[in-house]
Regions:
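Charge-biased, low-complexity intrinsically disordered regions
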Residues: 1-221
Length: 221
């Protein structure tokens, strides 16, 4: 899959760096080992963060800045990494969906980047373009119904929007039959070293908990 970054994104975030990750996998409903890792990280967050200081995490802070630059209120449409960590800090259970979805969430909260996790076989066309949502653009968020993506960074395939930092799209979501995982890591803070580390961590999780193989990633701008 080819990834293009539009001029409108370059204008609001010239330092943007992303990682495209692909892995062949076998999904399962639940992994105890993975949830042990998630629970350990949750304990660390509760000991070191508050719902205010989590906004200072580099990836979260940068994504919030881009939302504002695009005209979106980041407190109303929270980046997914922030929303997940905030949920932990409020003492709420993190959503348990499936092993693939859960490991993408773990990779996101560990590094603070909003990450899109997709079933690669559900895309239309061979190119994803990162742009900004338009007024009235149709978009069905996973478990959210139709959402207003005007002013949100959005990846589009040849049919339309598939992923934003707030919510991915129902059309390309992961399910238990997913065998070809595609992940997009969004480094709005421009920290290539951290984005690479996030990609490598995610691949490790996929190999450890979803029989991952034929894994690869590349950096894009």
């Amino acid at each position: 899959m080819k990834i293009l970054v539009s001029d409108e994104i370059e204008k609001v975030c010239p330092s943007f760096v992303g990682a495209h990750v692909e892995v062949s996998v076998r999904n399962t409903p639940y992994s105890e080992g993975l949830w042990n890792e998630i629970n350990r990280l949750e304990q660390l967050f509760r000991a070191t963060l508050t719902t205010e200081t989590l906004k200072d995490i580099s990836g979260i802070s940068a994504t919030r800045r881009v939302y504002r630059a695009c005209g979106k209120d980041p407190s109303r449409y929270r980046p997914a990494a922030e929303a997940l960590i905030r949920r932990m800090l409020q003492g709420k259970e993190l959503y348990q969906i499936s092993t693939l979805v859960d490991l993408v969430n773990l990779a996101s909260i560990k590094f603070g980047y909003s990450i899109g996790g997709f079933d690669a076989e559900k895309f239309e066309g061979d190119t994803l373009t990162l742009g900004i949502g338009k007024a009235g653009e149709p978009y069905e968020g996973i478990g959210r119904g139709l959402i207003n993506i005007e002013g949100l960074p959005v990846y589009r395939d040849s049919r339309g929007g598939v992923g934003t930092p707030t919510s991915d799209n129902e059309r390309t979501k992961i399910n238990l039959n997913t065998t070809h995982l595609l992940v997009l890591i969004n480094g709005y803070d421009g920290n290539e070293e951290s984005v690479r580390a996030n990609a490598e961590f995610l691949i490790r999780l996929a190999c450890d908990f979803c029989e991952g193989h034929d894994a690869s990633y590349y950096i894009y701008r």
